[in-house]
From Swiss-Prot:
Domain USP, chain residue ranges per copy: 355-636
Species in which this protein is naturally found: Danio rerio
Chief localization: nucleus
Record's compositionally biased regions (Basic and acidic residues): 275-289
Enzyme Commission number(s) of this protein: 3.4.22.-
GO terms under cellular component: Cajal body
Matches recorded under PANTHER family: RETINOVIN-RELATED, SUMO-SPECIFIC ISOPEPTIDASE USPL1
Subcellular location: Nucleus, Cajal body
Function summary: SUMO-specific isopeptidase involved in protein desumoylation. Specifically binds SUMO proteins with a higher affinity for sumo2 and sumo3 which it cleaves more efficiently. Also able to process full-length SUMO proteins to their mature forms. Plays a key role in RNA polymerase-II-mediated snRNA transcription in the Cajal bodies. Is a component of complexes that can bind to U snRNA genes.
Descriptive protein name: SUMO-specific isopeptidase USPL1
Catalytic site positions: C364, H592
């Protein structure tokens, strides 16, 4: 079709005619009637369909003539009737703007057709539109001395060019010769057609050309060496004519099988030239007289080319034809032009470290796949025909492998760019702008060649969305060498729980797709949910078992992975360690693919064609695990696995359960630091559950939020633990060896000082004081320090002791515990209400019982003859004694009230200082006392304001303590009545408690601190 150049630099014919017969010989092309109806003027031209048929089309690319609503008869009737003679016109002066753009390789040839029989009538130029290209006419009646070509034709004979004798064929139209042909448009020579199918000419090699006539092969063009090269000079231009000889050309049929011209049965055309006359061409300005056609590019005709959009971009001369695996044929002229372009580009532009493809035509799926292939370590380390990509011998591409050749071309482009880098004054690497453009052009040619290779099988189109899930297996299928690198064998195991349908089959794939994987998915435990093919029951489990793996293992996850930590997906198979090296991310929102390559330092290199040319690195993957689309595992040796940095996608895994093989610490590791670490790793949740003792900070928590009907019961619980049974270690502890030579003083010196104290809420659970083994106590006694005084030195051990789980047997040592019947969550109290309960002396507070590593736990025995009792223990025992004494005194008061028969006015409890303003009542072991105390301490008739802040009971206990300072056997009950009770009424247990209380130095000071609330 017209508008396409031949690439040889010479002008092309103005229009294409037909070689067959025309029934309507008098019909002139004229103007398009359909365009004339719209007020436009466009010429009609004939285009050959085959040797006998032509089609008349409008030169306007938008016009659909003759495919219009009017009938063909009406259209032909509207055509102007003129002379019998057809004109092939051309403009004498053709500007460069009128010529369509040149394309280096993919040039489509049009058909140059002549009229079968000329006529005498001349065509009136008035019938042609103004923009019609004027040419001279062919006639067999005209004669020009020594410069005419006679066409001896009849209607029955096919068109043929007879022997041209003593006449040169000239393209110079400046002298107005009627026989010369002026090629003003970039039209190729011609395409011959047979009766059955068109014949496509395929230029094979470019050599000096001459045409010789042969009777046996009239269509075959033979080579001669006697054709001289002539130079034609005109007034306006001086052109050097380079004539190239062409080897016998082949005819490409529609089945893409090359044939020779001998297969044409009718032999309609024969070309003969004399050996005496040269052939000269006139070259116009800015046109090159060189034929640049490669072996691989067949040329065909498309009559509707002007009306069809171009599907594929033009392929440059540097395009690598991976489909046929042949080398490029680049002319020396183009190399010289390329050098001139690169030398002329003096502007330096910065260049980035990574060279990859830029996003064009929505081809991110292909860019992501190509980036993965060129950055694959296994592909670069695997030899093809004994040559690796990293070897110096890899100067010639391996034509047996498409992937190997792709990587080789990529490396060659990178080396081309690297060799031209220049460091500027600002220490930034720069290259000439033309060099960078050339490198990007080569990458585009590589991508286009791979696209052409995938197009027949993938059925992909430019601008159409595709996925590497389908493209990668198809590409590897065409490359046996690369397919062996990605090939793996897996076995699917499936058994339906409903119909017992089982599947056990092995398959070989290069990319396996997984859907609906479980949360604990792992390559060695690859379970996913699927549907039974027999009963169609869903949520059935199918297991993937690895049987054989190659160097690269690729999996496609439709929903992504459940976890982002890629270290959990590394595995060992048949003595090889596999780790994730490359990820192809798929962003569903953008419908975009991005490739992430793990570097040797553990960082991830982002290669996003939308961010071209920038390729940032990331310490962690900045996208969720649900976008893990395709993962590639590559083999690593065990030595490399231990030496390389862990993947930075997540912190190292901390085991939350005891391992089968606990870690062993050497003697050199057993220092004070590791011992302190073992001591401080305590479970606060477990300690809060096990601790039910009454401390100075938990005393007020006990009475918080209690209503008037709550019953508080104080009981004594005896717990006992076997002396030979050590305290069980927690899973998070790291036990040190028993022979670890550390001192208690060094142990405490490494603990940071802090004033924080744990406040544990009371729960109705029994607690006990655990006696540690005697061996542990003996080991600690070497320091000549008592355990109690040792741990009292630091405030971190002053909180309530941590208790073991309840299943341990009770200890014989009695220990009171606070228990309440109503198990409800108590409301939170303001912290400023309990300032008086804080200990004033830090050194005398209750030590925190801890478990030393290896069972080195001291034995703490609280007797009257040993160390003084701590503040918490003294407070608890004192409250016990006072409550029992108040119970007995209240019983005496009840008897007096009953005997007197008179009612005593109950005091008002609205004041916070009132001893009757309490939040709960105490009870003893009989129901009579419970009812009496409830009536006495919670008067319903006189109470107007009962607040949880009322602590009159504690004030009453404190007043009793003050009275006991003079006489321990006498206690004060209330301001209304004071009763005395002899010491004989006190039980032996109270006497034992009193004897223990005599040894504490904090007896008065600590209890006087309760006065703040009263």
């Amino acid at each position: 079709m017209n508008g396409e150049g031949t690439g040889i630099g010479a002008p092309t014919p103005a229009l294409a005619g037909f070689l067959g017969k025309s029934k309507d010989r008098n019909a002139s092309p004229g103007n398009c009637p359909w365009c004339l109806a719209k007020g436009q003027t466009n010429a009609l031209r004939f285009y050959a369909v085959n040797l006998k048929e032509t089609v008349l089309l409008c030169t306007n690319a938008v016009c659909l003539y003759p495919l219009v609503s009017r009938s063909l008869e009406e259209v032909r009737a509207s055509l102007s009737k003129g002379g019998c003679k057809r004109s092939i016109s051309s403009l004498p002066d053709i500007s460069d703007d009128s010529c369509p753009p040149k394309r280096p390789r993919e040039e489509k040839l049009d058909v140059l057709a002549d009229v079968s029989e000329p006529c005498d009538a001349e065509v009136n130029d008035a019938t042609l539109p103004d923009d019609t290209v004027k040419t001279q006419t062919f006639t067999d009646q005209q004669s020009a001395p020594a410069e005419t070509i006679s066409l001896d034709k009849t209607e029955e004979q096919p068109v043929s060019i007879e022997d041209i004798k003593e006449q040169p064929i000239s393209h110079d139209a400046t002298e107005g010769q009627p026989i010369s042909i002026d090629q003003t448009e970039e039209q190729p020579v011609s395409i011959l057609h047979t009766e059955e199918q068109p014949i496509v000419l395929d230029l094979i090699e470019v050599k000096p050309m001459s045409v010789d006539h042969s009777e046996e092969q009239p269509i075959c063009i033979d080579n001669t060496k006697e054709r001289p090269v002539s130079i034609v000079h005109t007034e306006e231009q001086s052109i050097v004519l380079d004539l190239f000889e062409v080897k016998p050309m082949s005819i490409a049929h529609t089945e893409e099988k090359p044939t020779s011209f001998d297969h044409i049965e009718e032999k309609p055309m024969s070309i003969a030239h004399t050996e005496e006359k040269p052939v000269s061409l006139v070259h116009t300005e800015d046109q090159h007289l060189s034929i640049d056609q490669t072996e691989e590019q067949p040329i065909s005709i498309d009559p509707t080319e002007e009306q069809q959009p171009e599907e594929l971009p033009a392929v440059s001369d540097e395009d690598v034809d991976l489909c046929e695996r042949k080398e490029d044929c680049v002319s020396s002229t183009q190399d010289e032009m390329e050098e001139e372009v690169l030398e002329s580009s003096s502007e330096l532009v910065p260049v980035h470290s990574e060279l990859f493809w830029k996003n064009e035509e929505n081809m991110c799926w292909l860019d992501a796949m190509l980036v993965m292939l060129v950055h694959c370590r296994t592909i670069r380390g695997t030899p093809c025909r004994g040559i690796k990509l990293s070897d110096k011998l890899a100067t010639v591409p391996c034509n047996d492998s498409v992937v190997w050749k792709l990587c080789w071309r990529y490396d060659k482009t990178c080396a081309y760019l690297q060799a031209r880098k220049k460091q500027s004054e600002d220490k930034v690497l720069r290259v000439p702008a033309g060099v960078l453009v050339e490198a990007e052009r080569r990458l585009s040619a590589l991508r286009l060649s791979v696209f052409k290779l995938l197009q027949p099988t993938l059925k992909c189109e430019i601008g159409q969305q595709e996925t590497p899930v389908f493209a990668l297996p198809l590409l590897l299928r065409s490359d046996k060498w690369a397919q062996d690198i990605f090939q793996h064998t897996i076995r699917w195991e499936f058994k339906c729980t409903c119909c017992d349908f089982t599947v056990n089959e092995s398959v070989e794939k290069t990319l396996t797709t997984l859907t609906c994987i479980v949360k604990d998915w792992h390559p060695l435990k690859a379970n996913n949910r699927t549907q039974c093919n027999k009963c169609e029951h869903k949520n059935q489990r199918r297991k993937m078992v690895l049987e054989k793996l190659s160097s690269v293992f690729a999996l496609h996850f439709v929903e992504g992975l459940p976890r982002k930590d890629l270290t959990k997906y590394g595995f060992t198979f048949q003595g090889f360690q596999y780790s994730v090296s490359t990820i192809i991310q798929y962003n569903k929102h953008l419908q975009h693919f991005v490739t992430w390559v793990r570097q040797s330092n553990g960082f991830w290199l982002e290669l996003d064609d939308l961010k071209h040319p920038y390729s940032p690195t990331h310490k962690r993957l900045p996208f969720p695990s649900s976008e893990f689309h395709i993962l590639f595992w590559e083999t690593d040796s065990f030595k490399e696995e231990h030496s390389e940095v862990c993947l930075p996608t997540a912190p190292p895994e901390v085991p939350n359960a005891p391992d089968e093989h606990p870690p062993k610490l050497s003697d050199s590791v057993a220092t004070d630091t590791c011992v302190i670490s073992a001591l401080t790793v305590e479970d606060t949740t477990a300690s809060s559950i096990a601790d039910t003792s009454i401390g100075s900070t938990t005393l007020l928590d006990t009475f918080e939020g209690l209503t008037h009907k709550d019953i508080v019961t104080l009981t004594l619980v005896n717990s006992e633990s076997p002396k030979n049974e050590p305290r069980p270690m927690r899973p998070g502890f790291v036990s040190a060896p028993r022979h670890c030579p550390f001192e208690a003083s060094n142990l405490l010196s490494g603990i940071p000082k802090t004033g924080s104290r744990l406040s544990t809420p009371p729960i109705p659970q029994k607690s006990s004081l655990v006696h540690k083994p005697e061996v542990a106590a003996a080991a600690v006694s070497k320091t000549h320090l008592q355990p109690t005084s040792l741990f009292q030195r630091h405030p971190s051990f002053q909180s309530t002791p941590i208790r073991p789980p309840p299943p341990l047997p009770p200890a014989p040592k009695p220990k009171p515990s606070l228990q309440y019947d109503k198990h409800e969550d108590l409301p939170v109290k303001p912290a400023d209400m309990f300032g008086g309960f804080k200990t004033k002396k830090l050194a005398n507070s209750q030590p925190k019982q801890i478990s030393l590593p290896g069972g080195l736990n001291p034995s703490v025995k609280k007797t009257a003859g040993q160390e003084p009792i701590s503040t918490t223990e003294a407070l608890r025992l004192k409250l016990m004694k006072k409550l029992k004494a108040k119970k007995k005194k209240l019983a005496k008061l009840n008897q007096l009230l009953g005997n007197g028969g008179e009612s005593v006015a109950k005091p008002d409890s609205t004041a916070l200082s009132s001893p009757y303003s309490v939040t709960s009542s105490t009870t003893t072991y009989d129901s009579f006392d419970d009812q009496f105390l409830a009536d006495l301490l919670s008067p319903a008739t006189t109470v107007s304001n009962l607040s949880p802040d009322s602590t009159g009971l504690l004030e009453m206990l404190n007043n009793g303590q003050n009275g006991e300072q003079q006489n321990p056997a006498v206690a004060t009950l209330a301001p209304e009545a004071t009763l005395t009770c002899s010491s004989s009424t006190i039980s032996p247990l109270d006497e034992y408690m009193q004897s223990g209380m005599c040894h504490t130095a904090l007896e008065n000071a600590d209890f006087n601190s309760l006065d703040i609330f009263f």
